[in-house]
Amino acid sequence: MGTSASSITALASCSRIAGQVGATMVAGSLLLLGFLSTITAQPEQKTLSLTGTYRHVDRTTGQVLTCDKCPAGTYVSEHCTNTSLRVCSSCPSGTFTRHENGIERCHDCSQPCPRPMIERLPCAALTDRECICPPGMYQSNGTCAPHTVCPVGWGVRKKGTENEDVRCKQCARGTFSDVPSSVMKCRAHTDCLGQNLMVVKQGTKETDNVCGVHLSSSSTTPSSPGIATFSHPEHTESHDVPSSTYEPQGMNSTDSNSTASVRTKVPSDIQEETVPDNTSSTSGKESTNRTLPNPPQLTHQQGPHHRHILKLLPSSMEATGEKSSTAIKAPKRGHPRQNPHKHFDINEHLPWMIVLFLLLVLVLIVVCSIRKSSRTLKKGPRQDPSAIMEKAGLKKSLTPTQNREKWIYYRNGHGIDILKLVAAQVGSQWKDIYQFLCNASEREVAAFSNGYTADHERAYAALQHWTIRGPEASLAQLISALRQHRRNDVVEKIRGLMEDTTQLETDKLALPMSPSPLSPSPIPSPNVKLENSTLLTVEPSPLDKNKGFFVDESEPLLRCDSTSSGSSALSRNGSFITKEKKDTVLRQVRLDPCDLQPIFDDMLHILNPEELRVIEEIPQAEDKLDRLFEIIGVKSQEASQTLLDSVYSHLPDLL
């Protein structure tokens, strides 16, 4: 029994292990299938991403076909037809295409790079050849020039690139540059005080600070009582030289370690004076003034720098006992004496002077704004809108006749007021139109509502106030307001008044008016019959008979929905589209660029292949539209009307 139980347990464990292994294999196979599906999906995505199309005119049938573009690195070797797709071919050597295209020939690569330029990108099927200047040079006037080397005392302000030269700047105070370079910036002077040293020689724009050890804190060995120590940051070795003066009594020899661990700085000219000259031994009086009792002792420090210490004998004694002709002075104790007459540097004080000037300008602006606000408050509250309307009514009689006749259209000996025509048609919508034209407030609208009894009276008074309030009021603005509030019927009536082909009925032009201060003549109430209605009749002057209605661009806006009449100048020359209408469309298109391709697509069935080829050779879309106007305008009135309908359907802002 025990053996059978153990065997059953072993079989169960084996089955569990096999189940786990099987599950692991299934999971691995699923991951492998997912990875392969992603790999195979990538080229499909790439092929689906080629969504660009182009238009091609089949020369045999004359049809305009839409073909798929070829991918980058290829060109169209055969255009598509009704039964076949386009054929793409790889760009030959020396040519390339960067993007999807529908061209029949690849672009030629640029010429090989002239010396000393080097090639950054080679000529390939997808890229053009790109040439750059080698490192250390930049491109100037088509050639490579070396970067400028900043002289001593100047540092690099901006590093040079392949297209820009190095910019240098003079080292500011506290910095220096002792070597000419085209890459190094100005370095800061060594902080002697931070290293517990004294400044022996002040640095300039071309040299660094020279540091020395404080004599009060320096130490010497017992055998050499007078030692002056100097160091220079550019040398890794220094020499202990006996100075011409002895150190004060009481210096401890235990402080020598501090002397050895401190590195002082000395310029190269001072170091050359302190190094002994043992090359000439023949002349005892000329070359033995400075001697070394012992060879220089090399002492290695634990830091990265080490130095030699030269010990000079007292300069007052020679080797023979005679006095020396030259004496080397040791550095004095304490800090260097400051120059009482310091030079004024404008560059140092320029930042805070600029800030002070800006603050002064800001204060002046605030003071002026406060004074202006106080003057505005002293003027008192604004006048009541009703008083403004009364003044406007009084000024109406004083308005020049020329401004009043601007809104009157003379026809068959009758003067028809456009404002009265609009006021009789808009009804209660006059409030919205008036607010759109004048940006008027509710109080101003309420002033018209309380002063008149009928809507057409309020509308006429509001429109007259608009013409008085804004001298730039024009018929174009009025038409824009009517179209904004979907009153195209009123616009059609105005256009019919100005067109010679439409006759307005007398009952539509008769405006019922009640007597009011703003009415030029008493007119019966609306309840009176039609035969009692009258028109504003004004005999035109001889000059007004030859004057066009509205000198501005309002007339092309009114006539934009139809082609020119037979009496226009362009119609007599063979075009069915007026020059004013074409210029208005082209001017708007040039001011506000938009996609004109849908307009060209609508005209494809009207144009023949030769005309289509002429239009496609024009690079600019605006010039293409201009040429399209010229071609379509001489075909027929139906073709001209089709072009205008397409223009105003795709460019609604022109309406």
Curated annotation (Swiss-Prot):
Q: Which UniProt keywords apply?
A: Adaptive immunity, Apoptosis, Cell membrane, Disulfide bond, Glycoprotein, Immunity, Lipoprotein, Membrane, Oxidation, Palmitate, Receptor, Repeat, Signal, Transmembrane, Transmembrane helix
Instruction: Tell me where the TNFR-Cys repeats sit in this chain.
Output: 50-88, 90-131, 133-167, 170-211
**Domain Death: start-end pairs:** 415-498
Q: Enumerate the Extracellular topological stretches.
A: 42-349
Q: List the disulfide bonds.
A: C67-C80, C70-C88, C91-C106, C109-C123, C113-C131, C133-C144, C150-C168, C171-C186, C192-C211
Q: By its UniProt entry, which Pfam families does this protein fall under? A: Death (PF00531), TNFR_c6 (PF00020)
Q: What is the superkingdom listed in this entry's lineage?
A: Eukaryota
Give the Cytoplasmic compartment stretches of this protein. 371-655
Cell compartment(s), UniProt: Cell membrane
Q: What is this protein called?
A: Tumor necrosis factor receptor superfamily member 21
- From which organism does this entry originate? Rattus norvegicus (Rat)
